[in-house]
Design a protein with these regions (language model features):
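Transmembrane-cytosolic junction motif
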Residues: 63-84, 90, 94
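Structured surface patches comprising rigid loops and adjacent beta-strands/short helices at the edges
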Residues: 101-108, 218-221, 247
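A short macromolecule-binding patch
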Residues: 99, 238-245
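N-terminal recruitment modules of adaptor/scaffold proteins
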Residues: 81, 86-88, 125-212, 216, ...
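Canonical hydrophobic alpha-helical transmembrane segment
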Residues: 27, 51-67
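N-terminal membrane-targeting/pre-transmembrane regions
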Residues: 1-45, 93-95, 101-175
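Short acidic, Gly/Pro-enriched loop/turn segments at secondary-structure junctions
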Residues: 93, 109-120, 215, 223-235
Length: 278
């Protein structure tokens, strides 16, 4: 039996659900009052028609809000535990528990602070053959859930990845081409998007399809909302750049490189750690 630990929080439909229900109830009440008003008072025929039209329009608007609520309801909801995340799929009536240590790839799209996180998206999966679990802003406290998932990946996989680097191994990171199109597929529930490129990080080299970057040359890392992730040499020249949204598990990638830059891992001085990457 999997040890879930204590449940920490629930992440169901966000509070916008109650706002929509309250607004719909108010519209229905106002609409009903407008329809009943002509029956309770002596009003000119022209005014009666106006009131009936206004009442019908108000009720129709309330129905529109209820329909909007249906489409805004998240397919996946979550329970956050000490050792993982419990995922509820309301569409297929299934549930499963994903331990933090099993989370492989994490995708994050940052919509910008100007929108207050409304367009932020996070998705994670246990493996390349597993479906994506999406966390949109219509999930209650989605920002907290996403931050915990990323933080746990850093705590669980970070030490293992660093140990692999120290032992001369490589850590792969998948990237996505056409990230806007792939994000749209996630929004539509088509969660089988496949990364198209793999970066390989070792203690001595960052291997990409555009060329290799020696770790020894990297002196600084920038993670900017607009400019993305950029690696610089000692003269301030850009050695490598990639959009944050295009790199899966970008926070782990940043954490590993920052550790290697700040601690200057002497892998290139150790013959046992300079063998070619696998």
């Amino acid at each position: 039996m999997i040890d879930k630990g204590q449940m920490l929080s629930r992440h169901d439909f966000s509070k916008v659900n109650w706002g929509i229900l309250a607004a719909a109830a108010l519209l229905f009440s106002v609409g009903a009052a407008l329809l009943v008003l002509p029956l309770l008072s002596s009003i000119d025929e022209s005014q009666v028609i106006t009131l009936l039209q206004a009442g019908a329009g108000t009720i129709l608007l309330g129905c529109t809000l209820l329909a909007l609520r249906h489409y805004l309801r998240p397919t996946l909801t979550y329970r956050l535990y000490e050792h993982g995340v419990r995922v509820f799929d309301s569409h297929h009536h299934k549930e499963r528990f994903i331990p933090f240590e099993k989370i492989g790839d994490i995708y994050r799209f940052r919509g910008g602070q100007a929108f207050g996180g409304l367009f932020d998206v996070t998705a994670f999966r246990a493996g390349a053959d597993q479906p994506w679990c999406t966390v949109f802003s219509n999930v209650a406290h989605s920002w907290r859930l996403a931050d915990v998932i990323v933080d746990q990946q850093l705590q669980q996989r970070g030490p293992l990845a660093l140990n692999a680097l120290y032992q001369g191994g490589t850590v792969p990171f998948h990237t996505i081409e056409g990230d806007a199109r792939w994000l749209w597929q996630l929004l539509l529930g088509k969660q089988q998007g496949t990364p198209t490129e793999t970066l390989r990080l070792s203690a001595t080299l960052l291997t990409t399809e555009r060329g290799n970057v020696p770790i020894e040359q990297i002196r600084a890392l920038e993670n900017h909302p607009q400019r993305g992730i950029r690696l610089f040499d000692g003269q301030g020249h850009v050695l490598f750049a990639i959009n944050y949204d295009s790199l899966l598990s970008a926070d782990l990638f940043i954490a590993l490189l920052e550790h290697m830059i700040h601690n200057r891992i002497p892998a290139y001085h150790n013959p046992a750690m300079t063998r070619p990457s696998v």
